[in-house]
């Protein structure tokens, strides 16, 4: 048996090729798999469970069907942090906390989306702290649907514009934040996404950090079993 991890699919109605690739993944890649973990940014944007787009409901049906075969877990990303219990139940996913620790084939492992590790990006971390406040979420979720969609569009545009001027190091995780979280959780291994820089990093302290790949140009999954750790590319259309 094996455990699969994916993240940063950024699904949207504008990219039916990614949606189809994920549907194919759910249909073909879950054999001999004990669990699937989705590490955030499943959707390009999520403005509330009450206004899910038709394609999102199609995906919910597919995930629900897959969840009858194995448990599917979800950690919020920076694009879909407003996914709630309503959509989770609709799709058969179990929502996990922002940082989740588990025993993975004898290795203590911590899972997270990864944006919290980019501590050099001070403006984003300030926004992240605000958006995670329970009262801020409550206010946002009670705004008219048109207002929420407008805010989401402006935030996406601002993010894309500001990211063009940020350095490589600011956009990546801060090594000290990685080591601090590993120490605080007493974990030997970390798995995250967000940076779109898939790799298996052996750290100086003997621990390991694994980054899952994004799905912009091809699919990507991390496959871990008792004896193997592998990042696997999934070309679209195959």
Curated annotation (Swiss-Prot):
One GO-annotated biological process of the protein: lipid A biosynthetic process
Main location: membrane
Keyword entries, A-Z: Cell inner membrane, Cell membrane, Hydrolase, Lipid A biosynthesis, Lipid biosynthesis, Lipid metabolism, Manganese, Membrane, Metal-binding
Membrane topology: Peripheral membrane protein
Binding site for substrate: 78-79, 121, 159, 163, 166, 194
Described function: Hydrolyzes the pyrophosphate bond of UDP-2,3-diacylglucosamine to yield 2,3-diacylglucosamine 1-phosphate (lipid X) and UMP by catalyzing the attack of water at the alpha-P atom. Involved in the biosynthesis of lipid A, a phosphorylated glycolipid that anchors the lipopolysaccharide to the outer membrane of the cell.
Record PANTHER family: UDP-2,3-DIACYLGLUCOSAMINE HYDROLASE, UDP-2,3-DIACYLGLUCOSAMINE HYDROLASE-RELATED
UniProt xrefs under NCBIfam families: lipid_A_lpxH, PRK05340.1
Protein name, entry field: UDP-2,3-diacylglucosamine hydrolase
Gene: lpxH
């Amino acid at each position: 048996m094996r455990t699969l991890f994916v993240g940063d699919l950024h699904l949207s109605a504008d990219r039916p090729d990614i949606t189809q690739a994920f549907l194919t993944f759910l249909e073909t890649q879950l054999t001999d798999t004990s669990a699937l973990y989705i590490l955030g940014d499943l959707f390009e944007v999520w403005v509330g469970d009450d206004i899910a787009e038709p394609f999102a409901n199609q995906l919910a049906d597919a995930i629900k069907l897959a969840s009858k075969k194995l448990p599917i877990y979800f950690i919020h990303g920076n694009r879909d942090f407003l996914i709630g219990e309503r959509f989770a139940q609709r799709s058969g996913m179990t929502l996990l906390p922002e940082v989740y620790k588990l025993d993975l084939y004898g290795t203590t492992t911590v899972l997270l989306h990864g944006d919290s590790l980019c501590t050099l990006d001070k403006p984003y971390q300030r926004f992240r702290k605000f958006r995670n406040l329970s009262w801020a979420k409550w206010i946002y979720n009670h705004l008219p649907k048109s207002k929420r969609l407008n805010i989401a569009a402006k935030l996406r545009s601002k993010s894309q514009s500001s990211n063009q001027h940020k350095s490589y190091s600011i956009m990546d995780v801060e090594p000290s934040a990685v080591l601090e979280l590993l120490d605080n959780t007493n974990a030997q291994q970390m798995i995250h996404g967000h940076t779109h820089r898939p790799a298996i990093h052996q750290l100086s302290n003997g621990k390991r950090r694994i980054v899952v790949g994004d799905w912009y140009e091809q699919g990507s999954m991390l496959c871990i079993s008792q004896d193997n750790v592998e990042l696997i590319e999934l070309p679209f259309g195959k």
